[in-house]
Amino acid sequence: MCLCINKNAEFEKAEKDIVYYKVLEREKDETFPFIHKYKTPYMGVEVKLRKRYDENEEAETKELFFSDYIEKGVIHLFANYDNAVDRADRTRNGCVVKAVIPKGSEYIKGYFYPAIGCSVPSIGTKSVIYKRVVYKR
């Protein structure tokens, strides 16, 4: 998934914990039917709730018409709940998880791509804690 950013956008440091939203795919665990597994819809990375994840790969910025975009090197989050729900509804077994960028972590503001015109406010972060499911289909 890509994050469109303004040409002059820079990473900021979180002065406090910041709440955003992550869309994940949710599947039942075959060995424990009341437990679910979660994975990222684009990269297919399995994640666990209440655990911190850090992106160690360098963020690579590329040109895209009138803006730039970051393809990898950040963890993508939605800036608002309604946009996350809309994307979860378009994702196989989609759900929305409350995601916290921990104080002191780097993040960059941008827009979700492939949304038409890169118009859905989104965030790219180097660190995140997935807290709990706040929406499921």
Question: Where are the predicted features?
Answer:
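Conserved NAD+-utilizing ADP-ribose enzyme module
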Residues: 1-75, 81-137
